Amino acid sequence: MERFLRKFNMNSYYANHVKMFQALSPQWTCSHLRRNCLFDGVCAKQHFEEVMNRITERNDAHAAYRLAEMAQITMLDREKVWLQCYKSFSEPYDENIAEKIQICGRELLDKYKNSDMVTKIDNMIKFDPTRIVLDDNFSAFPYLYIPVNYGQMVQPIRIMRYRQIGYCFYQPDAVDDWIAPDIYPMRRPRMEMCRQVKEAVGSCSFTGFSGPVFQIMFFPMQMLPYMENEGFAKIINRYAQMAVQAIFTSRLHRGERYVTQLFGECPAGEFPMHHMMLRRWEGNGRPQTLVQMRHTIAGNKEWQTWLLPMILVRIAVREPANFEYVRGFMQGRHKCQLCFLKNGCDRETFYHIDVRTSEIVGCSTVTQVMIGEHVDISLPVQKIKLTGTEHLGRASDHYFKYNATTGMEALIRTAIQIHRWIRGTGIWENDEWQEGIYLLARVLLRWELSTQARSIMFRLFCFVCFGYAPRKDGTVPDWKDLGAFLDIILNGTELGDDEDETGQTGIMFELSRCVMTLAYAERIKVVTFNAPECDEGAVMNIAQAMANMWDN
């Protein structure tokens, strides 16, 4: 390959297409209808490397540029490229897939160690092992509002705390309204309640933190028994912390941006967050606010039944006639909002909000997307079929499909999706690692990418494979901040022509092919496929193999 490119002085544009097509040529099935694929009677699309070597030996410059032109034209039809590869990956043949993954992984690791990403992570904070997966599809924001009776704050029946946040458990039946926590008449009672929580509970039972309490949240008394469950309490604590951060963010000069991300629109005037939360919705014979509804409808042992279902709220904001979706979800104590929409409401679409991608690439902030399948180990993400410009996203534990207008839009949305799961328990430990590779492979194959986009893609591949790697001092970096993550991924050094031509795209393609082929072979039990096995007889944990690779 290198000899061919140098001998015929191929520029970077042709070189990238030639390298990419060489990698996917073994997957290609050609009909030979146009006959432009034939070189001396041999199909160059199916036997690209063989034809390339013959041309190099003959020193045939005309044939060389004809071959490069064929590769370039073929690669422009990205829909066909994707379909050819998808079909080939689903029909694995006899090969040592584990060895190939190791080879690709080591090549990628060498390039990662010499990249600017390694130096940038030194400034990141230390990894927090207690974190969980969080997204904005659920919210604990209603519990920040203060329940009052005849204008006076109700007294709690039980008090707890999580770090600087006081938890006040009360009886919702004794309340006639809920008001914003930052209005002037409530400042003194709220600070007094913070002082009482600090005196009653000196230190946090979850973290041991013994500092001051500066915020309070009111929870229905019915939730208290479930807070004794460690897993339940851990998730509620994190959503409570996110809600407190949200109320401070909404007061800043960029607060409109946060409100838009949460609801899909930002009303004019002061305190837009309170406007949305305390807006009265007609339904069930009398108007209700989101805060009132969330406080008065009790959940069960599942944490999702106690939070505000934001996907359904966004639908209600844009389609007020469908506000009953929110009430129905709460009263039915459902866990997955998209399953509820798809199976309980016979609805095929919902609204996906992405302010950051809109700011970066100029696409629409609110996108109507198709509801896909619920995450299920029996249906690997690789088997979800995508056509046209469709790409795959994920809302909590449910997939959805959307149409990306450009490769950069698909790439940015994919980066944000990957980050969302990494800032939780990490995608390097289970099947989400393969999910990240699949999403990147879809972008790599389906869209024509610029040098800048390929540079971003390379850093994302390195991150998915080696983002867990320790720094020089042995600590693991924490990637939870989306802004810091995107700064490293989007603003890194752009690959030069020499680097771009030395096989990064080919490495990424081959690694994608191996991981996707492995997932197919595991599920369909191909007899002639040499699938690596671990002691349990299942396909080995490739993520663990990649981790061992770094240590070596």
Swiss-Prot record:
Pfam families, per the entry: Orbi_NS1
InterPro entries: Orbi_NS1
Family named by the database record: Belongs to the orbivirus non-structural protein NS1 family.
Name listed for the protein in its UniProt record: Non-structural protein NS1
Organism of origin: Epizootic hemorrhagic disease virus 2 (strain Alberta)
